[in-house]
């Protein structure tokens, strides 16, 4: 038996708003410890990891481990129907993921589980020399600023500043943030702006983004709940461009 109840529908909605933009299907692993998933997009550019601990939920029961395959677009269609004050109840039964919203009325949705063989990807083991924090909204605003001129973004970090910049045909943009962290080795890398915009759809998950950056290395972006009961993280491959 699996059943999970949550008073805040935004946690699931904001998580899967980002996830559904990256991957079409996911395998959700259910256990006594909580809910987690690991997925890689078809182009092998973006890796996503979600972990919601059992303690996050107002009620949580999982008698035995279970793996369910879900179409993320169909799941997101349902989660978008949640109202701000709804209580969300998740359960599984006879090949369905059942989602109930309890508010002014009780609304029940059944999403058919996908019967496919799914190989859960393992996260690549990457060692970073740099880690720093940036306010999530500042990062999101920076992406919107860069989007005016370019479809790619350069991230740089040195001992004082985190810099997001772009050079476009019709103009340039640069945003600087004093991170206040200890950075031993400056780093620079270029990424797809659209891919980062997909990740930042999870704008209600955390107020802070943790960034790991290296020269021409994948970007690691981690969002952690203040309660430490949930984590959403991404790895994004860099754009390697030939020097002119």
From Swiss-Prot:
A GO biological process held by the record: regulation of DNA replication
Q: Which gene name belongs to this protein? A: pcn
> What InterPro entries does this protein's entry cite?
DNA_clamp_sf, Pr_cel_nuc_antig, Pr_cel_nuc_antig_CS, Pr_cel_nuc_antig_N
The uppermost taxa in this organism's lineage are: Archaea, Methanobacteriati, Methanobacteriota, Methanomada group, Methanobacteria
Pfam families reported for this sequence: PCNA_N (PF00705)
**Family per UniProt?**
Belongs to the PCNA family.
Question: Which keywords label this protein?
Answer: DNA replication, DNA-binding
Q: Give the protein's function.
A: Sliding clamp subunit that acts as a moving platform for DNA processing. Responsible for tethering the catalytic subunit of DNA polymerase to DNA during high-speed replication. In conjunction with replication factor C (RFC) stimulates DNA synthesis by PolB, relieving inhibition by replication protein A (RPA).
Subunit composition?
Answer: Homotrimer. The subunits circularize to form a toroid; DNA passes through its center. Replication factor C (RFC) is required to load the toroid on the DNA.
Put simply, this protein is called DNA polymerase sliding clamp
* SUPFAM superfamilies attached to this UniProt entry: DNA clamp
GO MF assignments: DNA binding; DNA polymerase processivity factor activity
